[in-house]
Amino acid sequence: MVEDQYPFKFKWKEAGLVNTPVNNNMKQGKLRYSEAFYSVQGEGKFVGVPSVFLRTFGCNFRCMNFGLDRGEKMRDEKQKEGIIHNQEVQGLLDKNIHKTTNRFEDLPIIHTGCDTYASIYPEFKHFNMLRTIDEVVEHLISLLPEGKWTMDNGQDVHLIMTGGEPLLAWQRLYIDLFEHPKMKDLKNVTFETNTTQMLHNNFKDYLTNQDRFEVTWSCSPKLSVSGEPWETAIKPQVALDYADVDGSDMYLKFVVADRVDIDEAGRAVAEYRKAGIECPVYLMPLGGRSEEYNLNVQEVANICMERGWRFTPRLHISLFGNAWGT
């Protein structure tokens, strides 16, 4: 079984990946993803860089408390087949939105919990695509302005592996993805990860030995504001595993709403530093909606200046609002 061969406890059945079944998907070289789109990177080190985003399906977290007032927790949670749903997601399910909506991009945007809920909850699995690596690559290439990763003017388009959590078992397919003939001019890959998933040995060896593209780990450990427990969210040994990939770059990025979150981020950074992780630290304001984001942005920027940490905006929120495909 796939889950027995990985050092994490992702609940495949709850994520809707067993009934696919994921084992057969892997054998057939098929990747399930919710969307692929071309935009500018809105967060972190490469803000403003033209990028193609590949959002894989499935996550080991739910982050149900994002967007709630401090001290408030998701109430009246309903359980269905062992799955705890965010209240807003449950409301959509009660209204049969997942059955009456025809297109992924027409699904409503929610304001609490994970804003990419359609990439993690199994009821929305049918909105996601299950494609061979050849088909995935064709989709990605079709999004590029010149049909190639390095443009005629010498500028390159980055590939962002995001989710969900892109470093679940799908990582087994990434060698074939990156070695595809139409990916040979790819120069930069960023993994946007919650930093809880160890790398598969073969994939780690591949990343260490290849010298064709730069690898960046955008590590965004979840704080208590997300609703995820510290002991499952803060994993310095996983960050060390990523840092062990020769030539790769890394930064920590924390989503924060106020000084309480920022103090907690400081404690988390101390844990990573103690483990030997020395990398830049970014703070990003919480806020999937422009109104919420604008309330937090100046305070977070001021605190970054106080503490010497780096500030990252959510550029895509300012440019496009919180919408699928941005």
Model feature map: region roles:
Residues 137, 141-158, 166-326:
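Conserved AdoMet/S-adenosylmethionine-binding subsite of the radical SAM
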Residues 29, 50-52, 110, 215, ...:
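A generic secondary-structure signal marking the coil-to-beta-strand transition
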Residues 35-37, 41-51:
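S-adenosyl-L-methionine
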Residues 32-35, 52-55, 161:
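Short, hydrophobic/glycine-enriched beta-strand segments
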Residues 47-52, 56-61:
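Conserved N-terminal beta1-alpha1 strand-loop-helix module at the mouth
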Residues 4-19, 24-27, 31, 65-213:
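Conserved Radical SAM active-site core
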Residues 44-47, 63-68, 324:
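Short, glycine/acidic-enriched capping/hinge loops at junctions between secondary-structure elements
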